[in-house]
Each structure stands twice: as structure tokens, then as C-alpha cells.
Amino acid sequence: KFKKNLKKKNLSVLKTREPGGSKSAETIRNLIFSKTSSTFHKKTDYYLMLASRNEHLINTLLPAKKKKLIVISDRFTDSTYAYQVSGNNIDSKVNSVNKNYILNSFRPDLTIVLKSSLKMINSRLKKRKQLNKFDKLKNSFFIKVQNVFIKLAKNNKKKYFLIDTSVNNNSAEKKILEVISKKLKI
């Protein structure tokens, strides 16, 4: 929906996701979410996420930046920090080194954090046709991850924007468009 609304304003927009976002990154994504991946050690999972990000960056994000496209990505480095580093206790110093090694100076201009109630999260998960391994984690994990995102957002209000989606989904979408429009000065 955001892509469509931004295109109406004659903006060149690329929508992407992580893990995935390029042909090679999608191959890694398929491995991450395969049935056998539930037996992967947490470090293996972490490095697969980074491998996918590297492919995504090289094959999608950097070319998009060169073309001056507006990129909307469903998840990026903060998700790795929230899910793998904080959620699965991966060493944050190791993550910082790896993040800088892969991204170099590449960073998102804006991160929108969607806050939702546990009831809403579970309701959305029930509507999905197929659940992945992250969807099947305990509520305590979701709370921990969401708290990390909220803390990131509160600690850097210039880069992050926190939107409560548990109130009304339509108003959340409207607010997201307002935030993006303000950031892009359109």
C-alpha cells in the first residue's frame, strides 16, 4: 500500500524484505525457513541471516541506492538485533563487527517500529495460512523482541518512529504514510 501511495506522487519505489530481497538472498531465506532449519543452532541461524543480508545489500539495496530509489524494506539490521542478538543471546559485540563489515557505511534513513499488543500479534498469526519458525515461538519471546524495538525507537527519535498498531490498523497505515512523507519532504 505504501509503495502504491508513493508511486502516485511520482516517486520511484522499491519494496523488499529480509531475509530475502534478491534471488540469492531468497535462496538463503528458503533455507532459513525450511523444515530442517528448526534444528539449526542459533549461531547458524544468525549467520544465515547475515548471508542473506549481504546478498540483499549487494544485489538489491546498493543498486537501488545508485538509482536513487526509495526503498521500503520489511525488516533489516534492527530485526537481527532484536531477534537473534537479544532474543537468542548472540554476542552484541560480534554482531556490531559483522554489521559494520557487511554494511560498511550503508544505513537506513528511517526505521518505523510497529508496536502491537500480544493479543493482536496472536490474532494476526492465527490468520496466516502458514507459520514459520519465528511465528511459533513463545509469547515471552515476542514480548522480549518488541521491547528491544521499542527501546531502540525511544533511544533514537531522529531515526526511529514508533507507531502503535493495536489501536486501529487503518490509522497506523495513515500514520506510516505521514511519517514517510515528512521524511521525504513530499
Indicate residue ranges for each PLM-predicted region:
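NTP-dependent small-molecule kinase module
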Residues: K3-N5, K119-I186
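Hydrophobic/aromatic beta-strand patches that form the interior of the parallel beta-sheet core
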Residues: T16, I72, L110-I112, F161-I163
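A short, Lys/Arg-enriched amphipathic alpha-helix followed by its capping loop at the start of a domain
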Residues: K1-L11
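Residues at the C-termini of beta-strands that transition into short coil/loop
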Residues: R17-P19, K115, S166
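A glycine- and Lys/Arg-enriched "phosphate-lid" helix/loop adjacent to the NTP-binding pocket
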Residues: S79-N147
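Generic detector of well-ordered alpha-helical packing
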Residues: K1, Y46, R75-S79, L110, ...
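ATP-dependent small-molecule kinase phosphotransfer cores
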Residues: L11-L103
